[in-house]
Design a protein with these regions (language model features):
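Ligand-binding loop in jelly-roll beta-barrel domains
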Residues: 119, 129-130, 139-141, 151-154, ...
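Loop-centered beta-sheet repeat module
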Residues: 219-302
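Short acidic-glycine-tyrosine-enriched beta hairpin
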Residues: 249-261, 391-412
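Non-heme Fe(II)/2-oxoglutarate
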Residues: 266, 285-321, 376, 403
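Functionally critical, mid-to-C-terminal surface segments that flank or help form catalytic/ligand
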Residues: 318-375
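A cytosolic small-molecule/anion-sensing beta-strand core signal
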Residues: 383
Length: 435
């Protein structure tokens, strides 16, 4: 390419010959596509081998909760706001959605490109969960999987109800809880910011034994006794609801290597007579024990039913969430998914088979190799170690180190993964044929 016409520019201009060549190797995306979240942590930068930053949560009130690994689906608001970028050998770069608008048929294959209008139908993210996410659900057909990468000892995540739930009772309780939160803010007025209220209330909520006296002095300072008593009563009610909701869900250990397929078990989907959806989930735990996970999911909406008494108030939609959630009991054993060896391919394992995606795990030993058969376009995520990839004809396809991801075009075909470090693992996520 000339100085005036970079690889990125040529591809965006529709250079078919160049797209053919580029589409036979990895399309590595930027590892820094971070999004701040109030529940996020700071382990994700070290995981991605990036230099540490100051304590961002203390500065902004939010940590780096997510990294959008492969984001190229403009019909989804989040994906459109945080598109992936691909950097080429000449140093130029371009947004992946714009590249796919030009070359989706060549890189994704005609069938996938036609079904999704030139977009990639998965939205994989790396999550850094330090505090509880909201209690949430997704529409029919929208399931998720979590591959636990690293975790503090004792970390858990809530997935699925552990008992049958009365829908009318739960919806009324969550709606009332939001009204109580609003009333607390009205009582506090402008004496404290919502962020300060959160800083005071969050540790008190997470301790079952703590009484309101632990937060009362600053929250209700100089307040008339009647209003102070009302405020303390509201907080006590909110705390009971906080734990009632959490205790109604399965607390699944976030153990590194665990794979959780968050989808209605077949017995539930059959009873509902609807396509499987994700079970109710609130990733994270009240103890604040941090974990990293690779999340594989389709792009699509999230309905928050309850935000675990978080301040400032974020938007929730209790009725929409109740419409999509399965309220019947689910056992953790129906969600945790074992890895199964792929016959004839040593070092290759399969975990999740979902109507929207399939997940495989490539685990070469140090300097060992794993042969991966040809498949449709997919994404790769190196979650530990480092790997070198070569094509079936021996051509170099690229490298992946821990925390890096790539889109693998359909033209790559079969390839070999060689471990460059001990304990290397690369997760492969492929859109299912019906996705």
């Amino acid at each position: 390419m000339t100085a005036e016409r970079t690889i990125a520019r040529a591809l965006l201009d529709g250079d078919a010959g160049l797209a053919e060549r580029i589409g036979t190797a990895l399309l590595k995306t930027s590892p820094c596509n971070f999004v701040e979240r109030p529940w996020g942590g700071m382990r994700i930068r070290a995981y991605k081998r990036l230099c540490p930053l100051p304590d961002q949560p203390a500065l902004t009130g939010a940590g780096l909760g997510e990294a959008f690994e492969i984001s190229a689906y403009d019909a989804d608001d989040e994906a459109r706001e945080h598109p992936s970028r691909v950097r080429f050998e000449d140093g130029s770069s371009a947004a992946l959605p714009a590249l796919l608008r030009r070359h989706a048929e060549r890189w994704l294959g005609p069938e996938l490109a036609e079904r999704h209008g030139g977009a990639f139908p998965l939205l994989p993210k790396t999550l850094d969960v330090r505090e509880l996410l909201s209690v949430q659900g997704h529409p029919d057909g929208h399931t998720e999987a979590y591959v636990i990468i690293d975790a503090e000892p004792g970390a858990t995540l809530r997935v699925g109800f552990n008992r049958d739930i009365d829908p009318t009772e739960l919806e009324a309780a969550l709606t009332q809880g939001r009204a109580w939160q609003q009333h607390v803010l009205e009582l506090v007025g402008d004496r404290l910011s919502p962020a300060r209220v959160q800083a005071l209330v969050a540790p008190w909520l997470s301790s079952r034994q703590a009484g309101t006296a632990d937060v009362a002095d600053e929250l209700w300072a100089a307040m008339p006794s009647a209003e102070r008593a009302l405020g303390e009563s509201l907080l006590e009610k909110l705390k009971k609801l906080y734990w009632r909701v959490l205790d109604s869900m399965n607390a699944i250990p976030a153990t590194p290597g665990t794979v959780i397929h968050n989808a209605n078990p077949p017995r539930i989907a059959a009873a509902r007579g609807r396509p499987a959806a994700a079970e109710v989930h609130a990733l994270g735990n009240p103890e604040g024990l941090e974990f990293l996970a690779l999340e594989i999911r389709r792009p699509g909406p999230t309905f928050r039913a309850w935000d675990n008494v978080r301040f400032p108030l974020r938007r929730i939609d209790v009725s929409a969430a109740m419409h999509v959630l399965n309220l019947r009991r689910v056992d953790p054993e129906e969600l945790v998914t074992p890895l199964e060896p792929v016959p004839g391919h040593p070092g290759l394992f399969k975990s999740v088979r979902d109507p929207s995606f399939e997940i495989e795990h490539i685990r070469p030993s140090l300097e060992g190799t794993v042969d991966v058969p040809a498949s449709g376009a997919h994404c790769l995520h190196c979650i530990s170690g480092a790997a070198t990839l070569t094509g079936a004809d021996g051509r170099a396809l690229g490298t992946l180190a821990r925390g890096e991801s790539a889109l693998v075009p359909i033209g790559v075909g079969a390839y070999r993964v060689t471990g460059a470090e001990a304990d290397t693992e690369v997760v492969k996520a492929t859109p299912s044929s019906g996705a």
